Regions:
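Cytosolic regulatory regions of ion transport systems
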Residues: 1-191
Length: 191
């Protein structure tokens, strides 16, 4: 049918939402590798060629350039990407990236590492310009990199009617954190 022809001609993208990951760190590379394993479109973006070395070594799609540069709009097709994760070491930069792409990708699908905003903290960035917290626990860049160095890994679990999300959570170690789930009916949901 027309759907099959469109796929064969590369006119139609994947059914899975793609991830654009800003910032090339060991943790973001692990996330990108898991997304690639799940056959979701993924792109790692960083302005540093050196930081992109791990992405290149792992055969991950990458973009070498400044995501906020106007030229990037012309050089990087964002069509396959429904989720943006800003995970550089600079929280203010991550917020700026999320704010910039919230209108194009959607405010509900731009995420950054770090805590949800405490509106009473005069040192924190306002929630109106930040991305959503990627983890419910508020893990920041240092937190995820430290956990990764201690053996933290991404795992995937196939859910079913007999083995649902709650049952899967019960089997995880106490220190485990759920990041996302893919539901065939409801799509991608960040946990």
């Amino acid at each position: 049918t027309i759907d099959l022809v469109a796929r064969l001609l590369n006119l139609k993208g994947s059914n899975r939402p793609g991830f654009i990951i800003v910032g090339s760190t060991p943790w973001t590379i692990s996330l990108a590798m898991m997304m690639k394993e799940l056959k979701a479109p993924v792109m790692v973006v960083d302005a540093s060629w050196q930081r992109l070395a791990l992405a290149r070594q792992n055969g991950l799609p990458f973009y070498h350039g400044e995501i906020l540069n106007e030229a990037t709009e012309h050089n990087l097709d964002l069509t396959p990407y429904a989720v943006l994760v800003a995970a550089t070491e600079n929280e203010a930069y991550n917020a700026l990236v999320c704010n910039e792409f919230a209108y194009e990708i959607g405010r509900d699908t731009v995420f950054q590492l770090g805590d949800a905003v405490d509106e009473d903290d005069r040192h924190s960035l306002p929630s109106s310009i930040r991305g959503r917290a990627l983890f419910e626990s508020g893990f920041g860049v240092e937190d995820v990199n430290e956990r990764l160095s201690r053996g933290w890994v991404f795992r995937k679990t196939k859910l079913s009617d007999e083995f649902d999300f709650e049952a899967a959570r019960e089997r995880l170690p106490d220190a485990a954190s759920s990041l996302m789930r893919q539901d065939p009916n409801r799509g991608l949901a960040m946990s």
